[in-house]
């Protein structure tokens, strides 16, 4: 897995390394101030290339989805005023390469199922339980978009 991650910049496999501890502290600060954190070039060039090749190879088997939902993945609720996110829809027209299509040696599967990434994220979210999402279609997927596809603004429901 270390060849998938840019382990020089992100030595997440060395839990007590000062560089890893600083990465966690910086990410926690970003989360506190902005609600998100950014890990530029987290994947190594090899890892990025391997994931891209895998996604391209499996693209033709992607599950298509074309729906209208609220940003909460629900049907509109007209008890809310017009324009309210609970009473407005956005279009979700994308295709997903799901976990069940990924081989056992898939680079993204190795990253997701390995303990290093889970431990790293758990360490930067102290006190929060963190589990892998086990749904074979909902977890660990590549989102494939073609011309005119769109993924409307929404709140994520999983990892």
Regions found by a protein language model. Name each.
Residues 36-38, 142:
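Conserved hydrophobic/aromatic beta-strand scaffold that supports enzyme active sites
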Residues 2-33, 40-120:
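Non-heme Fe(II)-dependent double-stranded beta-helix
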Residues 100-109, 113-159:
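Catalytic core of non-heme Fe(II) oxygenases with the double-stranded beta-helix
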């Amino acid at each position: 897995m270390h060849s998938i991650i840019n382990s020089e910049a992100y030595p997440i496999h060395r839990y007590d390394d000062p560089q890893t501890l600083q990465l966690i502290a910086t990410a926690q600060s970003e989360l506190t101030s902005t609600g998100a954190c950014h890990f530029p070039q987290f994947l190594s060039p090899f890892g990025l290339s391997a994931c891209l090749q895998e996604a391209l190879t499996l693209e033709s088997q992607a599950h298509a989805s074309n729906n209208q939902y609220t940003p909460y993945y629900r049907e509109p609720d007209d008890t809310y005023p017009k324009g309210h996110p609970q009473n407005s829809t956005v279009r979700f027209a994308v295709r997903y390469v799901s976990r069940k299509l990924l081989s056992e040696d898939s680079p993204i599967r190795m990253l997701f199922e390995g303990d290093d990434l889970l431990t790293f994220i758990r360490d930067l979210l102290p006190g929060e339980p963190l589990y892998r999402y086990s749904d074979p279609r909902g977890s660990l997927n590549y989102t494939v978009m073609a011309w005119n596809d769109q993924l409307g603004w929404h709140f994520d429901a999983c990892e």
